[in-house]
Amino acid sequence: MKYIVVTGGVMSGLGKGITTASIGRLLKNRGYQVTAVKIDPYLNIDAGTMNPAQHGEVFVLSDGGEVDLDLGNYERFLDINLKSIHNITTGKVYRNVIEKERRGDFLGATVQIIPHITDEIRYCISRAAQETVNGGKVADVCMVEVGGTVGDIESMPFLEAVRQMHGDLAPEDMILVHVTLVPMDTMGDFKTKPTQHSVKALRELGLQPDIIVARSSDVIGPQTKKKISTFTDVPVKAVVSAKDAPDIYQIPMELEKEGLADVVCSYLSLENREPDTAWYRVVSQEYTNRVTVAIVSKYGIEDVYMSIKESLKHAGRALSTEVNIRWLDAETFELHDLADVDGILIPGGFGKRGIEGKIRAIRYARENKKPYLGLCLGFQLAVIEYTRHVLGIEDATSEEMGDGTHVIAILPEQEEVSDLGGTMRLGDCDVVLKDGTKVTGLYGKTAIVERHRHRYEVNPAFIADLEAAGLVFSGTCGPRMEVCEIPNHPFYLATQFHPEFRSSPTKPSPPYIGFVEACKKNKSSSEIR
């Protein structure tokens, strides 16, 4: 097993996750099996109960793990399915160590950061690296991203564990990649001092980077690379420029041009095979059309809806269509804001803030024949809207939202649940689709698997009346309704599951493909009119 550990310096938000995924992609293009591990130094057990406005999207894995959005990028870039063990948090590590202490596993020893916590971290990394990710063989290379910034107190035990692993492994079995910021001053000169100090801080922890990925607004020239090399003892060939890119899927190509894959293969004693260019062809698809999609959302932070954004890109590329997103605040938007968009999307979420605005948007889409895609909460609100304005039950609502006629009810198994973390209906579930429906046409089959994250469902008492009124429940999982659609609408589809969590550039999500295609048709018909 080969390890590539990615750390970050100077500041957070430099793109360590994309860098990690991109390096993995470069190796995968050369025929190597790649897996990935994300270390999050926070004390939370997982991301499931964290505020999306602070943390960004909660990505859901196939086994139900609620994790950092970086794991979503790993899956999309590497075409793999990760598991909960691929996300290591301080909370998990400390919980495991405390449970071992309570069982007496340490035979009365005084439990300390070193060796007990660091040993647990090393075990977690090794175990995750050995876990097969697509049901095949164990990976050749494991990418390990250490979250946070060098110098953060929360990261110290993890970096110490990395130092120990680095010392125990052969030089060709582990390399360190350090991502830093190289800002440009008002005169247009690159400033290397932040990188110098960042590497100095890393060295003080006993870690010397093998490769420096220099993040900047523009390409870093040879002189700047030479200066960084001189002050960090990293060879010039291993100082890699990573400029800002308009599309994250361009980054592997840019790093390929910088020769990063050649350096990595050399350091890890891997055969530097001729890279397969199929993935590059997919992500370099040129656009011949453009559509505008309104996302009516609760949060004004795009990272909260990362997988939705990327899934629209995936579908757009497959259809040679650029998807422009218009973000609308569910509490403040006006209906005229929807008049010139080509489609409307309501994402998942929790809580009642912004609910009425989202229902107004859904009604507008239904009545004005605008393509509509509803996801999770967007599915539940579509049912509520239909119940109110077609069945005429004006106080229809969800049990989550308070008093009224509960057309959306809590799942029976959730009624006695008290803890919030890790207790929802999570991960992959089998869904059966009805023959002859829109959704079956999109998937091309009647048995599918999709990922879930919810506590509420369509109240079975209302299903017959809703279907009699024209709403078709075209997908089910046992007694649960999973998909609804309206047959006499250009495109009106809502899913209880989150299809965006299984979408990638090479395998765009069928509901998103159908939605973007419908947006194209809607735009064309509008232009004709």
Swiss-Prot record:
Gene3D superfamilies: 3.40.50.880, P-loop containing nucleotide triphosphate hydrolases. Its EC number is 6.3.4.2. ATP binds at G13, L14, G15, K16, G17, I18, D70, K243, D244, A245. Residues 293-525 form the Glutamine amidotransferase type-1 domain. It is an enzyme of class 6 (ligase). GO terms for biological process: 'de novo' CTP biosynthetic process; pyrimidine nucleobase biosynthetic process. It holds the Pfam family CTP_synth_N. Pathway: Pyrimidine metabolism; CTP biosynthesis via de novo pathway; CTP from UDP: step 2/2. CTP binds at S12, D152, I153, E154, K191, T192, K193, P194, T195, Q196, K227. The keyword Signal does not apply. Allosterically activated by GTP, when glutamine is the substrate; GTP has no effect on the reaction when ammonia is the substrate. The allosteric effector GTP functions by stabilizing the protein conformation that binds the tetrahedral intermediate(s) formed during glutamine hydrolysis. Inhibited by the product CTP, via allosteric rather than competitive inhibition. L-glutamine binds at G349, L377, G378, F379, Q380, E400, R455. The keyword Ligase applies. Mg(2+) binds at D70, E145. GO terms for molecular function: ATP binding; CTP synthase activity; glutaminase activity; identical protein binding; metal ion binding. CDD domains: CTPS_N, GATase1_CTP_Synthase. It comes from the Archaea. Keywords: ATP-binding, Glutamine amidotransferase, Ligase, Magnesium, Metal-binding, Nucleotide-binding, Pyrimidine biosynthesis. UTP binds at S12, K191, T192, K193, P194, T195, Q196, K227. The active site is at C376, H498, E500. Homotetramer. CTPSs have evolved a hybrid strategy for distinguishing between UTP and CTP. The overlapping regions of the product feedback inhibitory and substrate sites recognize a common feature in both compounds, the triphosphate moiety. To differentiate isosteric substrate and product pyrimidine rings, an additional pocket far from the expected kinase/ligase catalytic site, specifically recognizes the cytosine and ribose portions of the product inhibitor. Belongs to the CTP synthase family. This is CTP synthase. It comes from Methanoculleus marisnigri (strain ATCC 35101 / DSM 1498 / JR1). The lineage of its organism: Archaea, Methanobacteriati, Methanobacteriota, Stenosarchaea group, Methanomicrobia.
